[in-house]
Amino acid sequence: MKECAFTIVAKNYIGLAQILGQSLRQQNPSTDFRIYVADEFSEEPPTLPAEVLISKDVLSGLTVEQWTDMAFKYDLTEFCTAIKPFCFDHVFTDGYEKAYYFDPDIYIFSSIRTISEALDSHSMALTPQVVGIHSHYTGEHPEWAMNVNGIFNLGFCGIKNDDWGRRVVAWWQERLRDQAFADRSVGQFTDQKWMDWMPALLADRLCVLQSLGMNLAPWNYFERRICQDAEGTIHVTFRSDDNPQRDDRLVFVHFAGYDYSKLKQGIIERKRIENLKEYDDLALINLSYRDAIVANTAVFDAFITQPYTYGTYDNGDPITTFHRWLYHGLTLHDSPFKTGPGTFHDAIGRRGMLIREKIDNVSRRNIGNIEGKQRLLAKFYGLLYRLMGYKRYVLFLKSLYFYCRPEMHTFLINKKRS
């Protein structure tokens, strides 16, 4: 049966995706592999391997206007995930009977034959974030975050090219054209949250892959222990005794949040998930991935400095998340990347919204003196309460839920409302 695995990257991660491809071919030589590049090369690109495809040139189902709209209103992660069902459609159009998506920061340790077998009798295969029933949850990644972001992790997704698989892809395409934001206030989280619908829509046509050895990742390290047998095969078991013990072969690991440039230097360091515990048994997989990146330094370095095409206006000014969401609220149809009189760039510039300081990555984890700032905000809200009184203060807080979304602040640049 003709099968294809693929990933989606901005062009700076082509090298990381090639390392994923190497791991796939080592363990699964009969499975084809593709890399869909979400952005473009502004100049003549270096010679690209045949497996690398420029998405804008090959994907169907989106007009030029829709592509531009999505490329601007979504940030890099949102955009790469938003085109995922269109990539599935492209793979199916090329005649493949089964398609597997893997995030570029995944490394495959053994055969994916069990996934292929699952799709023999199902239309879709997904991996949950966590597979054990933990009455007393001890994971560092909070349960509420998985409730918000989705029960399944879309670092992996397998779909069969049958009637139900194609229907899911079409359904997914329609929603991700406009609803692939990471916006908790409206229950959206990229392409991933939509998969919570699959048990209801597909019922027994969905295969939930509960193997401990699939999509092993930082958010489930707390429940899974790594071990290696005398033959060198890596296995995964439950770390605690609150679930019936299992012994599953390690298939693939999702190295999400690792600092890949540091890995290239031989340094294992993670950038996401606060207070993540270091488990000694993880050294086996961490060192394997580190060694793979070190061995492919030239591959990794070939594209890593390439800028994200859709990260700036045509004059080089950076596009912030606030710009993207504000544009989305205006429902404009002209090219938002353009600069000059009468453009979106001109409108936000006149309101002082063009700054070089990087504010998108500022959070409570990296901002200085967070406790002092929280105390200052508490004093500010205390003053508001005294000025407004109980009733108006409560109603004001309710309004903040509405106005926490940048789309609701179009009045800042919309002359008719200002």
Segments (PLM) and residue ranges:
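Glycosyltransferase catalytic domains, chiefly GT-A lineage
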Residues: 1-418
